[in-house]
């Protein structure tokens, strides 16, 4: 007969399986969904005030996302992905966050990884996407090689933030003959932290640190 595992051993597994599940069940097909292998998200997200200054939108994202299920649950947590977009009138909006993606191992635990959206749906009109954003449920968490590789870039800007609300920005310049740029948000200012100096660096996600000024 197989021994029964103590409840305290099963609790982390149960939490991992449930992180973000109610949010997904209640909102899939309404606030986010799949079209084939891609993910779409609905906007605007009422929790984020729109602005003509995209940084004002970015600064609201982390506090709002961290209120969602599992968003700050460390290795047992849930990533959320979304987009920043406009309707062509010079005002930027944020979409709802999507938990859709795959579950990946992190050490001895498992984490739910989100897929950046390929499309934003807004009933008011045609959308133009500027950036994708995603959260990490632990801290500190810098941009990874996966986050930086050229093949994984969908838009002009990539925003990432961790559970401590350290916000990173990547300008990939995927089709331009200039370095990719990695920034961190500090006291309302973007500080340059690293460069992806060559096309090969951008393909591989290799960052050369720069001295912060």
Describe these PLM feature segments.
Residues 19-123, 201-213:
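Glycine-rich short-loop/terminal segments
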Residues 1-16:
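Sec-dependent bacterial lipoprotein signal peptides
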Residues 2-6, 109, 156, 183-184:
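Intrinsically disordered, low-complexity sequence elements enriched in Ser/Thr/Gly/Pro
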Residues 21-24, 114-213:
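Active-site-proximal loop/helix of nucleotide/amide-processing enzymes and allied scaffolds
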